[in-house]
Structure formats: structure tokens, C-alpha cells
């Protein structure tokens, strides 16, 4: 019973914040313009500030774990390849690009940081998980949506240039890079700067979760039910079953294991829908997968955490 209570305490507050976002939109406190701006604020300001504070204030030499970062990178890359092969039977009826992106791309930054902080009181190894996944997420999302788009057979130079520029200027990646440099050089942070950054950083989790909930829409599920269900099962179950045993075998525990779980088995991020639409896909499969995985992950993540707690790994 104690293990179940631990799991519920870890997951319910996170999803309640998302539910609050949905409620606030429903009653008119959040409108579409505000939700868009809130998402942008979290992505451009609050989350980079959180990552900078977390990494910059740590001893990077002690915190860095090459094996863990490579594990996160490798598991993500293999997830993308598996998603591609599983998508082949559905390619006549749905966008392969949407299927692959929705199957592998998690809400790693927002939900990952929220879960680790909620359980351990700090952000622990979630930052290292983000280093191993977010750059690859962004690169491969553009590649699969471009190459696996109906009528598209190759990546153009302009598209690749735009992708590289997007990665270099990604605020989350910039926050990580500046934090790493700050930590490596052991630069002292003035009290005023530290408190200002901290105040911005604490906004990332609650605002990010509420923005995700507010952006959530019940659409797209009635079409393409079978591929949506397959995609969702892969996202919430299959990748966890395939790759978590390797994480345990490699000796990862506590915040590293929780961050890996979020990377593998959390809901498909809402930004997948935005990106799919912006690259010429209809977005229906993505919207349906976001809806189903968001609802399902409230139960699946609780279950996985319960299993890990019973094994005394978290």
C-alpha cells in the first residue's frame, strides 16, 4: 500500500495541474491567445532558466554521466527506428511521419522535470536526460515529417538549413549549454541574479503543465482509430518494456530511472501536433495520439512507478 501511495503522490499532482489548465480554458480564464503566449514563455524563458539554474549550480564534473546520456540517446534513436517499421502497414491510410513522431516524442522536458522534482524535491538527473533526447527529438521530427510526407521524397537544403538553425537557437538547448559552461568555469552567481533566475525557474513546471492541459483538445480520435491505438500503446507500454530493463541493468536508480521512464513512457507532447501541421500534415493522427496518451499516461506512469518502487529502484 505504501508503494501505491508513493506512486499516486508522484503522478496525481502533475496531472491535476494539466486538468486545471483544461478547466481554466473551459471557464474562460485562458483563451487561445493566452495559451499560445504561455507556451512560448515557458519554452523561451522559464524552462531554459530552470535548466540553467539546475545545471549551472551543480558540480558538472560530478553530475555528468556519459553512460546515462548515451543510453538516453540510444533508446531514443532505436525508438524512432522501431516506430518507422511499425508504421509501414499503416502508410496507405495515414501519414507515416505523424505516426513516427507521435510514437517516439515524449513530453520529456516539462513532465520529466515535474515528476523528478515532485518525487525528489530537486530536478536531479532530468537535465542529463534532456541533453540526450531533446536535440535528437528536434532533428528527427523534421526529418521524418519531411521524408515521410505524402508527395515528399527528399530533404531540401533549405529545410536542413532551417532545422540546423532551429537546433542551434533552441532556447532549451541554449539554457543547457550556458548552464554547462557556467558550471565548468565555476562562475560565481551574484545573489540578485540567482534569485531572479530562481523566480523565473519556478514558473516553468506549473505554467508548462497548465499550458499543456489548456492546449489539449478532443479531436482527431474518431479518424484512424487503429493506428492511434497502436501508436499510443507503443508510447506508453512497448518502449518502457523494451528499454527500461537496460536502464536497470546499467545500474540507474532513483532520479535517473524516473527521468528515463518519462523519456520512454510519458504522453506524446502537444508540440507534435503544432509541428505536424506546420509541415503540411493534417494532424488528425497526432491529435488523437496526444489525447489518448495524455489520458492513458495518468494510469500507466502510476503503474510503472509502482513497479519500480516495489523493486526499491526509486
Identify the residue ranges that each predicted region occupies:
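Alpha-helical transmembrane segments of multi-pass small-molecule/ion transporters
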Residues: 1-314
Amino acid at each position: 500500500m505504501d508503494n501505491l501511495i508513493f506512486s499516486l503522490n508522484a503522478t496525481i499532482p502533475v496531472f491535476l495541474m494539466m486538468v486545471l489548465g483544461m478547466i481554466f480554458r473551459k471557464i474562460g480564464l485562458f483563451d487561445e491567445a493566452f495559451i499560445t503566449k504561455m507556451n512560448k514563455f515557458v519554452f523561451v524563458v522559464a524552462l531554459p532558466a530552470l535548466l540553467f539554474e539546475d545545471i549551472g549550480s551543480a558540480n558538472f564534473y560530478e553530475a555528468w554521466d556519459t553512460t546515462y546520456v548515451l543510453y538516453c540517446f540510444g533508446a531514443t534513436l532505436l525508438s524512432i527506428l522501431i516506430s518507422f517499421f511499425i508504421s509501414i502497414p499503416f502508410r496507405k491510410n495515414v501519414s507515416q511521419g505523424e505516426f513516427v513522431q507521435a510514437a517516439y516524442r515524449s513530453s520529456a522536458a516539462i513532465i520529466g522535470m515535474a515528476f523528478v522534482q515532485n518525487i525528489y524535491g530537486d530536478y536531479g538527473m532530468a537535465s542529463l536526460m534532456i541533453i540526450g533526447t531533446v536535440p535528437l527529438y528536434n532533428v528527427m521530427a523534421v526529418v521524418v515529417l519531411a521524408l515521410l510526407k505524402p508527395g515528399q521524397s527528399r530533404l531540401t537544403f533549405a529545410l536542413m538549413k532551417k532545422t540546423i538553425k532551429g537546433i542551434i537557437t533552441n532556447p532549451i538547448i541554449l539554457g543547457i549549454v550556458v548552464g554547462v559552461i557556467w558550471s565548468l568555469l565555476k562562475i560565481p552567481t551574484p545573489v540578485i541574479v540567482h534569485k531572479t533566475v530562481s523566480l523565473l525557474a519556478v514558473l516553468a513546471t506549473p505554467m508548462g503543465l497548465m499550458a499543456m492541459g489548456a492546449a489539449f483538445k478532443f479531436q482527431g480520435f474518431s479518424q484512424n482509430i487503429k493506428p492511434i491505438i497502436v501508436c499510443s500503446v507503443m508510447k506508453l507500454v512497448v518502449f518502457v518494456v523494451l528499454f527500461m530493463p537496460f536502464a536497470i541493468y546499467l545500474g540507474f536508480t532513483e532520479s535517473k530511472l524516473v527521468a528515463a521512464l518519462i523519456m520512454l513512457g510519458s504522453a506524446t507532447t502537444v508540440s507534435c501536433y503544432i509541428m505536424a501541421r506546420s509541415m503540411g500534415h493534417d494532424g488528425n493522427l497526432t491529435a488523437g495520439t496526444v489525447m489518448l496518451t495524455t489520458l492513458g499516461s495518468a494510469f500507466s506512469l502510476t503503474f510503472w512507478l509502482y513497479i519500480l518502487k516495489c523493486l526499491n529502484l526509486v
